[in-house]
Amino acid sequence: MRKVRMRVTGRVQGVGFRFMTKMVADQLGIWGCATNEDDGSVVIEAMGPDEALETFIEKVKASPAPYGRVASFTLTENPTIE
């Protein structure tokens, strides 16, 4: 099981980004959480099987929300997420 932390900036708050991210995660069997940060970014902590997590990461990069737009994306491997 792989565990990652992602920070996403752009139009990611107030557009359903976290809700749609949760829907994608549920479809792929990914567990975790997404939080709005004061700086306007969203931080996502996620874990799941490698192949499903890779698909999830690609969908987050493309913005799962129709009105969202990802300006930057950082990924950190994070084995401490539980």
Q: Where in this protein do the model-derived segments appear?
A:
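Intrinsically disordered, low-complexity, mixed-charge
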Residues: 1-82
